Amino acid sequence: MSWIKEGELSLWERFCANILKAGPMPKHIAFIMDGNRRYAKKCQVERQEGHSQGFNKLAETLRWCLNLGVLEVTVYAFSIENFKRSKSEVDGLMDLARQKFSRLMEEQEKLEKHGVCIRVLGDLHLLPLDLQELIAQAVRATKNYNKCFLNVCFAYTSRHEISNAVREMAWGVEQGLLEPSDVSESLLDKCLYTSHSPPPDILIRTSGEVRLSDFLLWQTSHSCLVFQPVLWPEYTFWNLCEAILQFQMNHSMLQQKARDMYAEERRRHQLERDQAAVSQQLLREGLQASGDAQLRRTCLHKLSARREERVQGFLQALELKRADWLAGLGTTSA
């Protein structure tokens, strides 16, 4: 089945969608697509068929999101923990991924028409090399599209993502691109796999399980969490509407306020750190007792500007390193 399932909503679906759109709408929804194996057991089919039906439901859900004006979707496709499953199931999932990413490369016209940028987030080194190459082709082919975004978390856990971001910052310090004092929560944000995306407004988990399973733990601290009992392959447009309605009724205004307060708290902490560093600098230079407010402001501005220059240089180097790795995959089989 296609990644992009085209088609319009029914008359009744459009009517309800328009009612929803009268309220605050999420810009970014994340899904834990749980229940494929239970669906297969329920329908007395092979597990692989359950996973295949789960992919078909993803294509349908992306169409609903597009029709509702939700322009960014992140899905938990394969956890690093899933490698602990039986070899036959893991091999089947890798084969399914090969089929779907190969199909993706055949759908360039649809992707271009809808402006869909595909990002694959996770430790791709853990995947078979041929699958890495297919993923790299898909990411490169769609990287300049910007109407809507699909983030596929594959070989991913949040703990792995955060520890990788810490390693990237340590690399920046080792390379002389950063000072140890440049390391902060804000910089860690920019080193995550999701650095180009806003935090999800809603995180939806299907199948009735009430846990996050190590998915987007850093990014969802202020997200609306919705746990729904339906198995993923049986997910419907109405389940999605229910989740959006929960967001509108309980969370949307508080969410933005909480994010603004948290951002302000980060800025305040950074200012306090900068003020302490300037005080130490003036003390070393024998100017602490001068009490010159203009001098302190000048020093603060210079300190902030130098840090921002280092951080931007580091982030550019990090982007280049990641892009070079993807480009290298494209030439592996050549």
Regions found by a protein language model. Give the residues of each.
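Flexible, compositionally biased loop and terminal segments
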Residues: 1-334
